[in-house]
């Protein structure tokens, strides 16, 4: 089991760890209208998956805005996944004035978190992470942020996304 910190305290990550070069496992999450969504729904497109503990926090808000602003300039898709309820994600999108942001909720089964090794066991939230997948769902970049309240390496993730 991998360990990170969150606000300085130790947190254990559970789930299957994936690495660069692996093919990304499938997952089932919910969109803002409670429809089931899987990785297969985005087949044939490169993907930047931004994982946040809660969309309602300052760091998560900034991470979501930054990746959507920068990566949306490229061909492909940006997904933001958290364990927030779909209603909270929908409210955040509306209050942020962002209609092109795709937020997905892993609250029900933690399917994404378990399959990508980012479930913070003690908090039942997802750890801050970034995964970049090519159009065939091969993982070309992975970062699990070692301190959950820190930002990911935006430059490295965006460079990996742009270079696919």
Swiss-Prot record:
Its EC number is 1.11.1.24. Disulfide bonds join 60-93. InterPro entries: Redoxin (IPR013740), Thioredoxin-like_sf (IPR036249), Thioredoxin_domain (IPR013766), TPX (IPR002065), Tpx_CS (IPR018219), Tpx_Peroxidase_subfamily (IPR050455). One of its GO terms (molecular function) is thioredoxin peroxidase activity. The active site is at 60 (cysteine sulfenic acid (-soh) intermediate). HAMAP family: Tpx. Belongs to the peroxiredoxin family. Tpx subfamily. The active site is a conserved redox-active cysteine residue, the peroxidatic cysteine (C(P)), which makes the nucleophilic attack on the peroxide substrate. The peroxide oxidizes the C(P)-SH to cysteine sulfenic acid (C(P)-SOH), which then reacts with another cysteine residue, the resolving cysteine (C(R)), to form a disulfide bridge. The disulfide is subsequently reduced by an appropriate electron donor to complete the catalytic cycle. In this atypical 2-Cys peroxiredoxin, C(R) is present in the same subunit to form an intramolecular disulfide. This is Thiol peroxidase.
């Amino acid at each position: 089991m991998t360990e990170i910190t969150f606000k300085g305290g130790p947190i254990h990550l559970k789930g299957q760890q994936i690495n660069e070069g692996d093919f990304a496992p499938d997952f089932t999450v919910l969109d803002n209208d409670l429809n089931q969504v899987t990785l297969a729904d985005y087949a044939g497109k490169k993907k930047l998956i931004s994982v946040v503990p809660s969309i309602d926090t300052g760091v998560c808000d900034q991470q979501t805005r930054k990746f959507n602003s920068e990566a949306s300039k490229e061909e492909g898709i940006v997904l933001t996944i958290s364990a927030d309820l779909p209603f909270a994600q929908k409210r955040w999108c509306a209050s942020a004035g962002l209609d092109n942001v795709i937020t997905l909720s892993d609250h029900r089964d933690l399917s994404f978190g378990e399959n990508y090794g980012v479930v913070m066991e003690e908090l039942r939230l997802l750890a801050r992470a970034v995964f970049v997948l090519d159009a065939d769902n091969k993982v070309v970049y992975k970062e699990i942020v070692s301190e959950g309240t820190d930002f990911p390496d935006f430059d490295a993730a965006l460079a990996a996304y742009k270079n696919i």
